[in-house]
């Protein structure tokens, strides 16, 4: 595995730009994938849309595991590739994918057995449960395919190839977009399967995408090969994987839980504020898309350079990324500040919702630059093999700062006080993370690939 994409030698800014642009397309595709499913299912009525909403906690848990395992694969493979240890990288990826399949297949089997008890516990009624069953039976079949796809794509990204995963996910989204209306509504020769059709369309798109990802990993790039059964080796590789994956998965679960607490606080003050906050968080996912694309590119870049014994280059990339995202998000805020009210009117016509959403757009994005610094630094810590530090930073932001400040703000000035607490939290944590980033260094015990 040569340095095909220049991660170890080409100009840092150019490499990160070349890696981030395809990542940007990939993330936009995933957002579009979700929106298309939601749109077509919403045409079936409120009950179908409610049924899909009930599946969110389960899909979130599976996705969080996939993101955690993907972070572990990207970090460990990046170091092995950077150190020139291609044979060990191939074996590590084999063992990581094997563990991923065993874990997700087991969880999916259990989930399919306990669909009714689990979703009844989540509050689904007798009308929603049959719809949830129809959807989740196929979703559980496809869950191992989805997670293998996500982890396999991270394997490709660890080499610096972000274009192939983006193309794969774009193709999957196109297939899903074509099949959704055909199978949901029974257009032409296709049967009308309604909510079940949405699940089948998604399953088929994942299968095609996984086939392409497997072709690239196994045949084109020769990144994966069958390894002999050796329980000691597998246990050692799984331990390295879990060291990154467990905190990363947990970190991904904390954010929606904290948002749920904020929404509960808002519900006690004004239900219109809940609607505004929900719309605001959806807008936030779009406004932070460049942050997500850059952080996804930075992790393999840092990992490869640390594996190659180039810690200074890794640190330069980190600091350059932090400065860029601060400037970019600050410039992005300027038009938002001027057009907060017209933008809010796209989401609602209710006067009270408009007032709160306009205020949200005016105050929260002003600190998306510091928030971007927090996100990128926390991601970089995984590449530095400091996943617990990454988790602690997020816990500090959400539990020690955001929630207490939000409670205090709501007590002092209701909805406005609560919302103002969020950018203040992001500003304080952004300053702290930039300070820490300037002092980061490679841990002694992780300076070589043999001691990952």
UniProtKB/Swiss-Prot annotation:
It is found in: Cell inner membrane. The keyword Cytoplasm does not apply. Keywords: Cell inner membrane, Cell membrane, Membrane, Transmembrane, Transmembrane helix, Transport. It is a multi-pass membrane protein. Its main location: membrane. It comes from the Bacteria. Pfam families: MatE. Disruption phenotype: Deletion of the gene results in a severe decrease in flavin export. Mutants lacking the gene have no defect in reduction of soluble Fe(III), but they are deficient in the rate of insoluble Fe(III) oxide reduction. GO terms for cellular component: plasma membrane. The chain crosses the membrane at residues 21-41, 49-69, 96-116, 131-151, 167-187, 199-219, 248-270, 283-303, 324-344, 357-377, 392-412, 417-437. GO terms for molecular function: antiporter activity; xenobiotic transmembrane transporter activity. Belongs to the multi antimicrobial extrusion (MATE) (TC 2.A.66.1) family. PANTHER family: MULTIDRUG RESISTANCE PROTEIN YPNP-RELATED. Flavin adenine dinucleotide (FAD) transporter that facilitates export of flavin electron shuttles. This is FAD transporter. It comes from Shewanella oneidensis (strain ATCC 700550 / JCM 31522 / CIP 106686 / LMG 19005 / NCIMB 14063 / MR-1). The gene is bfe.
